Amino acid sequence: VKQKINLYTKIAPCGCLNSFEDQDFLKEYKYWFLALNWEQGFLGRSLLFLKTHKTDEIELTDGEVLEKHAVYCLWREAITKAFNPDKINQAQLGNEEYLHRGHLHWHFVPRYRRPIHFFGMDFQSDNEETQKLSYGSVHKRAVHPADIRQKIKEEILKYL
């Protein structure tokens, strides 16, 4: 297991993302990096962070936009092979800017319309009513143990 010491400082030298040390780093790209969200109510929930300070999509360069799309497609393929979600929600809210201090980011949230189990745990799935709602209104906020997140990370990285 690789240590995460100073990892976020290396990726974003401004230090703004140091509070995200509990996020499980997945992969670094030129402009972005992927991290597993510590809240795994929906199995495979991930974050895509911009390395530089920008708070709105209109500020992105063409290179950043193209890479964001490419990374999403790579992640989508990996998450499909790993867990086969029925749908993906994407969200870019920016409501907690005090946490990331202006690093634009997206939430990638796999949704499942069937019971989903992994590594001996049950994860959140949708029923007919909840599948119509945004993930923010139905997800269960719970930090999952590091060993579970590590197994999820390993499964995604097999395909990423």
Regions found by a protein language model. Give the residues of each.
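Histidine-centered divalent-metal-coordination microenvironment in nucleic-acid enzymes
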Residues: 50, 95-118
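Active-site helix/loop of acyl-thioester processing domains in fatty-acid/polyketide metabolism
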Residues: 69-82
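Short histidine-centered catalytic/ligand-binding loop motif
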Residues: 47-70, 133-145
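A generic structural signal for short beta-strands and their flanking turns/coil linkers
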Residues: 30, 42-45, 84-86, 102-104
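Short, internal acidic amphipathic alpha-helical interface segments
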Residues: 80-87, 107-109
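Active-site microenvironments that recognize anionic phosphate/pyrophosphate groups
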Residues: 1-54, 150-160
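A short glycine-rich, hydrophobically flanked beta-strand micro-motif that places a catalytic Asp/Glu
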Residues: 83-98
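C-terminal helix-cap and adjacent tail motif
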Residues: 3-16, 110-160
